[in-house]
């Protein structure tokens, strides 16, 4: 799985990090 560089970013990329949780598509 890919890692997200930052938390709470825009959440419109292939790897979303929102509210402390990351979801990679």
From Swiss-Prot:
Native source organism of the sequence: Ctenus ornatus (Brazilian spider)
Cysteine disulfide links: 4-18, 11-22
Tissue: Expressed by the venom gland.
GO CC annotation: extracellular region
GO MF annotation list: toxin activity
Main location: secreted
Location in the cell: Secreted
Name of one Pfam family that matches: D_CNTX
Protein name as annotated: U11-ctenitoxin-Co1b
Binding partners and assembly: Monomer.
Cross-referenced InterPro entries: CNTX (IPR035285)
UniProt lineage: Eukaryota, Metazoa, Ecdysozoa, Arthropoda, Chelicerata
């Amino acid at each position: 799985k890919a890692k997200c560089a930052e938390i709470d970013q825009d959440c419109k990329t292939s790897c979303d990090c929102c509210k402390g949780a990351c979801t990679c598509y």
